[in-house]
From Swiss-Prot:
The name this protein goes by in its record: Phosphoribosylaminoimidazole-succinocarboxamide synthase
Superkingdom of the source species: Bacteria
Family, as annotated: Belongs to the SAICAR synthetase family.
Disulfide-bonded cysteines: none
CDD domains, per database record: SAICAR_synt_PurC
EC number of this enzyme: 6.3.2.6
Pathway recorded for this protein: Purine metabolism; IMP biosynthesis via de novo pathway; 5-amino-1-(5-phospho-D-ribosyl)imidazole-4-carboxamide from 5-amino-1-(5-phospho-D-ribosyl)imidazole-4-carboxylate: step 1/2
SUPFAM superfamilies: SAICAR synthase-like
Length: 250
């Protein structure tokens, strides 16, 4: 597969065309950002780790009947993905109160929610990705009621699968954000990435009651280096994948 011209560059990834019109080339970057890009730093090896972690998670989800846009990992920081038309939407699932949910609703961080909360945020940097509801999305022609009738149950299935996956490696899935898109034939797919950049992950191995972050909150809150945490997530996921018969890159 030949990598052609750059189509897009975001905060954490670059997207390229390939010689197959239905396949794109993704390059993961070493940059980490917070606060709508106001805080930024490069971490050597982060792109490689996020590429590995996304590949592992998408492979584990596939074993559980959930398809993604992933075609194959093709290099340390690169992967091939199916071309999809993305919804300009961040889809957030919350299992435990944290982050924006706490500041918005005055809830103490760490409280277990009685049921998972599904939220939508419009992807718009100028407006700081505002929180929107179903009616907003339909009124603004971001998606249709029929789209939402597919997106919501798929998001909840992904949440259930990820809770189970992370529980197997002694990690609590606090919350996460995902994106979805449609292929040329209209199939709805999980797309973009699932990494410690896009999840809150708390270590459940004994830390004497103290929250041990294994995610980008280490960077957001100046709590420490993210690389050892990302390496730990990658290592545990790789062991789980091997135990399930998934081929893992060494």
């Amino acid at each position: 597969m030949e990598k052609l011209e750059k189509l897009y560059e975001g905060k954490a990834k670059q997207l390229y065309a390939t010689d197959d019109p239905e396949v794109l080339w993704v390059e993961y970057k070493n940059s980490a950002t917070a606060g709508d890009g106001e805080k930024k730093e490069d971490f050597a090896g982060k792109g490689r780790l996020n590429n590995l972690i996304t590949t592992l998670i998408f492979d584990l989800l596939k074993k559980r009947g959930i398809d993604s846009h992933l075609v194959a990992r093709v290099g340390e920081t690169s992967q091939l993905v199916k071309k999809v038309t993305m919804f300009p939407l961040e889809i957030v699932l919350r299992n435990t109160a944290a982050g924006h949910f706490c500041s918005r609703l005055g809830v103490e961080e760490g409280i277990e929610l009685k049921e998972p909360v599904l939220e939508y945020f419009l992807k718009n940097d100028e407006l700081h990705d505002p929180f929107v509801n179903d009616d907003d999305l339909v009124a603004l022609d971001v998606c249709t009621r029929e789209d939402l009738a597919e997106i919501a149950p798929l998001a909840r299935r992904i949440n259930e699968a990820l809770i189970e996956i992370f529980a197997k490696i002694d990690v609590k899935l606090v919350d996460f954000k995902i994106e979805m898109g449609r292929t040329s034939d209209g199939t709805l797919l999980l797309a973009d990435e699932i990494t410690p950049d896009s999840c809150r992950l708390w270590d459940q191995r004994d830390h004497s009651g103290k929250v041990e972050h294994l995610d980008k909150d280490l960077f957001r809150r100046d709590l420490g280096d993210i690389i050892p945490a990302y390496e730990e997530i990658e290592s545990r996921l790789a062991e789980l994948a091997k135990s399930e018969g998934i081929e893992v890159a060494e």
